Amino acid sequence: MKKIFAAVLLAASAVLAQEQPNDQAYTDAIRRYTTDPNFMTELVDHLPASATVPTPLKFHGYIAGQEGRLTYAEDVYRYMRALDDASPRVKVFTLGKSEEGREMILVAIANEETIANLDRYREITRRLSDPRKLSEEDARQLIADGKPIYYATGAMHSPETGSPEMLMELAYRLAVEETPFIRSIRDNIVTLLTPVIEVDGRNRQVDLWRYREKNPGVPTPPLVYWGHHVAHDNNRDNIGLALNLSNNVMKAYFDFHPQVVHDLHESIPFLYISTGTGPYNPALDPLMIDEWHRMAYNEVNELTRRGLPGVWTHGFYDGWAPNYMFWIGMGHNSIGRFYETFGNRWPTTEERVVRGTSERQWFRPNPPLPKVRWSLRNNVNFQQSGLLLALNDMAKNRARFLENFWTLSKRSIAKPSNEGPAAYVFPADQKRSGNLRDLITVLQKHGVEVHATQQALTIDPAWPPAKPAEKAADAKATDAKAKDPKPKSPNVTFAKGSYVVRMDQPYSRLADALLDVQFVRGEDRVYDDTGWTLAYLKNVDFTRVANADVLEVPMNLLAAPPAAPASPASSDIEHARKYFADPSTKKPRIAILHTWLRTQDEGWYRLALESLGVPYDYISTQDVAAMPNVREKYDVVIFPPVGASSISGDIVNGMAPGPALPWKTTELTPNLGGIDETDDMRPGLGLSGVQHLTRFVKDGGLLITVRDTAEWAIDYGLVRWVQSVPLAKLKAPGTIVRGKLTVTKSPVTAGYDETVPLFFSNSPILKVGVREEQRAQGRPSGRGGANDPDVPQGRPFVPLPEREKPKPGEEGFQPPEDAAYNFEPYMPRPEDRPKVLVTFHDKADQLLMSGMLEGGDELAGKPAVILAPRGRGHVLLFAVNPMWRMNTQGMYPLVMNAVINWDKLR
């Protein structure tokens, strides 16, 4: 079939370019399902006919964006493979599987010659990616011979349903249409498509549409599970690379080294083309940022010229964190970008009111309409028109994209001699070498090179080092030397075998973004986390070395991560791995508890335990409500944060009353269930569940609560003498702060140093005790200054006694200064009091390690980890999130030590 098609094309391409007929039925349907002529362009208002290649209409029986139609991932793949079978311009590859075993694919589209020689073209981009192995002359020849590659991905976020439909039509159009516009794309570039990123969630979303069609007039269950572990956060995995979808897309990147990676999303109206408001990540090359803007404004201009309303850029997203999927491109010297197209979730036509974004702004002079009748086909038209213009821009600037790719790679390896630093060095003699092994593993998955030194290394990390003459000229320095017979040397010594991440490698900017310390001003508007310094999150030692002499030290490139430590410290993640892998150890019976409100944050906990080889049962709040004796089945219950804006009452009461919202596997919904099932998502924990968990703790169990579930435990009385403090001015959006151990002999904190990096995100702020904090009183108005005592006249002065400082463990439980006997009935016994194991640093100016922090005085000294006894058991409360997005391995042992020692916490 392909040979016949190729022969026809060679014989008649000129005629087709002039006279190619349209598929009239398909073209009529495009116009029927588009709600306004201004929501179409000449690029997508038709579809050419083909005698040999099937359209989506011929294959599926409906067009892309048709009312009432959504396509399962497997059916999208069947169509793409039908194109592969029918056209020599299309080739389909398998990328890998999801956690539930569903396939992810990659579709390559170009002209016949390019597809036939695809390996040659991807070898060109691979060679251009590493300037260390290529002469300037050879690079120029490769740029002249090569073709840039544009990689677009769809359906990462499962409720965003339009992109798989659109990408099927786009693939057909690129393979079949013979207009000069499309032929230029096909002849000059390679287009790569992954039509469905989150395949598990896509199929669940289509199931819910089928349910909605069969059950009109009643609410449709919310999409509580997207992927097997997480939902929207699948676009926050580009640091940890813990999800299959992230690793599959990374594989596609390294297979082809595309010059653009473009994620297709759906939210705000009508089409937002990413640039961002800033702050931009400081590791990014200015050339890359300039290219973002050039491409975005080109598409905004071209679509606005064609009469489309509501196409804009700038005023959404920031450009700061490297955790988004399109950073797979940006971290590897390619352009990363995304669209946000207006969507209805369902394949229905809806009357929508647009507020806020329909207002004209300097960055949005052509705003969306304030009221609109919006269809799925409108969504397809906007996405496809924009993407076609982007592809055409690459085709017209073929050499520019390859040249920029090469130039960005060259500038990356020049980093040590330009802006620096030269390297990041991780000492070999780490206390938590298992955590370091995890960090190195992540870097290598990103393609970042890590070396091991062949000998010990002593170096001044600063650059340039001070000259002896300059030191002698400094009188103060000379005086200091005279007073200190052993002045401190600026040099740092690293043992043989220490690990070096060199900055003279192609992906130095990604390594720098992940390893350096972040600072964000409090007035900046941020979109997500602000601090992610990997060495802090994994609690390992490192040194940022600006001195380029470090690059002259003999070292070997690591082919694989180092071996796991044989005897890991208790604060090393390998400790839990070895404990649960050892058949001789006593294993606790563990349950992870989830609500039916939201499962994303707890999904990261499931993934964390699985990564450590820890077995667990997965139960819902409804299960606990029906389980009077939880202790009979479990020793430890982990209740991860619910997330979003959930409050304690929501956990107990569940969703609003109404018709049942089933989440289960049926003939109609074969992809629901599996992870967990219920006949009705509405009921919550209920007061019976609160009682059952209270009994579980009293009977000797350990309940671990985090953030909002810690507040729930406080609000519903599972924990006594702990309060949540309202916020006034604190701003810490995804920030790494410094914590201090207050109890060093607890099994929970075993192996930790006196200070520990903690990941904290705005709330909660907790305090312990039975009385309000006694604040220092100011003096009354009188003589003297603010610090002078007030002296009554006519008698000798009697000073006010100094307040007695509370003894360790009595903070918040100190009796009143006067008539303490009146308070005795209300004072809990020492053995019943909650113990603060870890606090936030007590000095506000010492709190911030990485990210944004304002109003830190509200956080300073407050509890971060509390162990509250109750009966024979305990509730462990975290104000921080110790298992966040598979990045915070340095905090995992605070959870796992408690789990392992659940019956030894007294």
Language-model regions, residue ranges each:
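Short amphipathic alpha-helical "recognition" segments used for binding
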Residues: 6-7, 480
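Short, solvent-exposed turn/loop segments enriched in Gly/Ser/Thr/Pro and often Arg
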Residues: 196-199, 209, 264-271, 709
